[in-house]
Amino acid sequence: MKLPLIDYRQFRLSRLNTPQFRHLKLLLFWPIFSLVFCYLENYRPTVYYAPMRCALDHWIPFCKWFVIPYAFWFLFVGGMLLYTFLYNIPAFRRMMWFIILTYSFALVTYLLFPNCQHLRPTLLGGDLLTRFTAKLYAADTNTNVCPSIHVIGSFAVYFAARDIRRFRANGWRLGFLTMAVLISLSTVFLKQHSVLDVLAGLAVCAAAYPLIYRVPAGAASLIPAGGLGRKRFPEL
């Protein structure tokens, strides 16, 4: 079994700023993101939510089978974060900075442009997938949908896979890309998102990708320690 690059059992708070452990500070983003998102979802004062819809939404049928890739998203993102955290710290840093940049942009968008969707159908039937979708609808509100974090997170994983030597073979790349596309499609076939939300998520990814993964060598001095760019952090 492949051993982790760093023995995290040696971590002490006093060593947080050492080169060995300073990437752990990037994990602080997750509680901050969760708190802000929770506030926007549940505690912000009542505001007008702009409905996101386009003509194409009404041509896309609801398909309960897409709840499978939709739910797999959590394992997809969490699994890649865990893998890079254990076995490829530079890739972990770049993936986290990509997430920090794109997710933060999404939060600012939700704050300044509150949005929602009214595309969910009435669910009929008592089979497992329908019941699971009903639970998903109950747990996840229909607000703060554009840009889609499901789409952004999916392509964060794909870009991270491209960044790791062992996943650069065409078979691996195609597998990760296929899953990212399936998850993105699941958001519209489950009526969790409008096509507009997906397109906005893809646009955010396209804008962020060169900032994280294609930083010019001459700009490396402007990048924060533990921060962005392949030139700054050669692969282990």
Regions found by a protein language model. Give the residues of each.
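N-terminal transmembrane-helix/juxtamembrane module of multi-pass inner/ER membrane proteins
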Residues: 2-77, 124-129, 133, 233-236
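Aromatic-anchored segments of alpha-helical transmembrane domains
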Residues: 34-36, 103-111, 178-188
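Hydrophobic alpha-helical transmembrane segments
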Residues: 67-82, 100, 104, 153
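Interfacial helix-loop-helix junctions of multi-pass membrane proteins
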Residues: 121-123, 142-146, 182-210
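Membrane-interface loops
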Residues: 41-57, 85-171, 212, 219-236
